[in-house]
Amino acid sequence: MKNPEEAADGKQRIHLRPGSLRGAAPAKLHLLPCDVLVSRPAPVDRFFTPAVRHDADGLQASFRGRGLRGEEVAVPPGFAGFVMVTEEKGEGLIGKLNFSGDAEDKADEAQEPLERDFDRLIGATGSFSHFTLWGLETVPGPDAKVHRALGWPSLAAAIHAQVPED
């Protein structure tokens, strides 16, 4: 169990349900240029039903009367995208998760209880290989934060690759 000092620091452990990755249904994602100031499920589908129009300049749609311009963005090669959800507190928090798949061999070991106040379980509800990135009135373009973030894996691989000796 964590001590009170760790609890005060706001540290949390996040446990991924690996089985949810295999069963994640394909999802169609839209990254909108807005904030949803709610920390609970929001009925976005009531307000955003994408009637996407294709033209020479890219994709067009509208959200609550505002014009949107968009583009399709692919997940970097070698990666997969997942839509993750946090399970409610207490839902399934019964023991230490076994990721090795050899539950029979580990059955005799004492299980460490998950801490209901600090641990979170997440699972995948959808998977994607691309998504639509929207901007207000203009296509986001290559300088968008999302494009820069998606470039990091290839940059990290390049700077950590071995340099051949001459």
From Swiss-Prot:
Record's keyword terms, sorted: Acetylation, Nucleus
Keyword Acetylation listed: yes
GO cellular component: nucleus; ribonuclease H2 complex
Location relative to the cell: Nucleus
One Gene Ontology term from the biological process aspect of the record: mismatch repair
Modified residues (N-acetylmethionine): 1
Record text on subunit structure and interactions: The RNase H2 complex is a heterotrimer composed of the catalytic subunit RNASEH2A and the non-catalytic subunits RNASEH2B and RNASEH2C.
Family the entry assigns: Belongs to the RNase H2 subunit C family.
Function: Non catalytic subunit of RNase H2, an endonuclease that specifically degrades the RNA of RNA:DNA hybrids. Participates in DNA replication, possibly by mediating the removal of lagging-strand Okazaki fragment RNA primers during DNA replication. Mediates the excision of single ribonucleotides from DNA:RNA duplexes.
Protein name, per record: Ribonuclease H2 subunit C
